[in-house]
Amino acid sequence: MPSLDHFGIIAPYYDRTIPLKAPQHLIELIGLPIEGAILDAGGGTGRVAQAFEHLATRVVVVDLSIGMLRQARQKGGLWPVCSETESLPFPDASFERIVMVDALHHVLSQKRTVNELWRVLKSGGRIVIEEPDVRKLSVKFVALFEKIALMRSHFIAPPEIIAMFAHLNAMTQIKLDGFNAWVIVDKN
């Protein structure tokens, strides 16, 4: 039975109802500006990626929702690509930076996604994953709502995200700020 395309339904309203907060903080965590390409994995409408448009040579937005990517295309300056994050259509070492904001809990296989992000990251590159910190009570309510709404979400704590990178010999760190956590992964 096909699942409901929640994101396709909300795509035209997404940017207005969920605006990007504090892009400067994310820009600093990612380490911008750079010469090279940035991948916004699970980037939907490109609301995050548009903050990087003039800070890199190319900004690619990957998402599975055609409705969300239509919104990204309207922004201009972004390269929207329809794909699962578990099987990215890019050669190895394609990106200097990768960001995944509020999306890891929506993918079917977090482990495969992590491995794919690592595969397409260049040596010397950085991945920043921003996720709601499921250890917080308010996030537990969000997780419950998404489960009731049949949104295939699977929230995991920041240390569990870090553990998925352990076999890759990645340099990792966690930054916390209330509702969100940022997992920062560097590839030597």
Residue locations for each model-derived region?
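C-terminal lobe and adjacent flexible extensions of AdoMet/dcAdoMet transferase-like proteins
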Residues: 184-188
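Short catalytic micro-motifs in class I SAM-dependent methyltransferases
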Residues: 102-103
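C-terminal alpha-helical "lid/dimerization" subdomain adjacent to the S-adenosyl-L-methionine
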Residues: 17-18, 48, 128-183
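Conserved class I S-adenosyl-L-methionine
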Residues: 1-33, 47, 68-71, 142-145
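A short glycine-rich, Lys/Arg-flanked "PGG" loop and its adjoining helix->strand segment in the class I
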Residues: 111-123
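Class I SAM-dependent methyltransferase SAM/SAH-binding core
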Residues: 39-41, 45-87
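Short glycine-centered segments of the SAM/dcSAM-binding site in methyltransferase folds
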Residues: 37, 124-126
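A conserved beta-strand element that flanks and buttresses the S-adenosyl-L-methionine
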Residues: 99
